[in-house]
Amino acid sequence: MNISNYYWHFPGALTPKFCDDVIAYANQQEEVMARTGGYGDRKLKKEEIKDLKRKRNSDLVWLNDTWIYKELHPYVHEANARAGWNFDWERSESCQFTKYKHNQYYDWHCDSWDKPYEKEGPDFGKIRKLSMTCQLTDGSEYTGGELEFDFRNYDPHMRDEAKHLRRAKEILPKGSIIVFPSFVWHRVKPVTSGTRYSLVVWHLGKPFK
């Protein structure tokens, strides 16, 4: 799919109080090891954990609170319109509160899959269309942890990776939001000091026609 805007940003959109409230609330909840889609919810073997952490190493908490969605949804609607995507979406998945501590990261990935959700429930038959990442800590509170995008869509003629990477510096101020199509490739580089807290939400709809 060809698009003119690969992401839309809102610098410092969320108030410091909201960010701090989410951090405090999430830190009271049960923390789990971050996974990628292929591992599901089953108990992992040591070798599987080792293999997983080559791709993704972070800790997270799942949140489903109305007060969080109420704050975030207006930005999803605005970005969807202003960026010119105009994707039809119906509902949001659970919010993923992520902690990136020293040497933690998430290598190159996209948030969508080649098939819609097959498990019975409200997500059945839907795909991830829009992704949102919210910066809960200020960029001055940690080093490393850069959010980067790859806009090549894996065109074989675009072999010089450096020319097609975009480091999203717009995310650095506390409370900033970036919304992007879920098929866009991105990564979070290793944090070298401090802790980066983020909130990620995926917004679902019927497959593109």
Regions found by a protein language model. Name each.
Residues M1-V179, F183-K209:
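Fe(II)/2-oxoglutarate oxygenase catalytic core
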